Amino acid sequence: MAGKSSGDRRKPIRKGKDGKNAAPAKSVRVGVIDYKDVATLRKFISERGKIRALRITGVSVQEQRLIARAVKNAREMALLPYAGSGR
């Protein structure tokens, strides 16, 4: 396996018009994210209740930190659940 690397086996990223790969932060000004704005924060949380990675959401590192802090504050204030809705 002289020419093979682990990168050759990856699936290509599909970017369709269905909106699945659209970053939620592109339509939201991340500078105004507040822990009280639960509707906006839910765009950055998975069904299991985890904060989505910045490579999935398409935000910068600084914006990801703001989002993570806002989500954690909202969880502490019982505006968002710690765990998702379940299976």
Curated annotation (Swiss-Prot):
Protein name, UniProt field: Small ribosomal subunit protein bS18
Q: Tell me a GO cellular component.
A: cytosolic small ribosomal subunit
InterPro entries given for it?
Ribosomal_bS18 (IPR001648), Ribosomal_bS18_CS (IPR018275), Ribosomal_bS18_sf (IPR036870)
Q: Name one GO molecular function term.
A: structural constituent of ribosome
Species name for this entry?
Leifsonia xyli subsp. xyli (strain CTCB07)
> The organism sits in which domain of life?
Bacteria
How it assembles, according to the record, is: Part of the 30S ribosomal subunit. Forms a tight heterodimer with protein bS6.
From the broadest rank down, the organism's phylogenetic lineage runs: Bacteria, Bacillati, Actinomycetota, Actinomycetes, Micrococcales
Asked if the Swiss-Prot or TrEMBL record annotates the protein with the keyword S-adenosyl-L-methionine, the reply is no
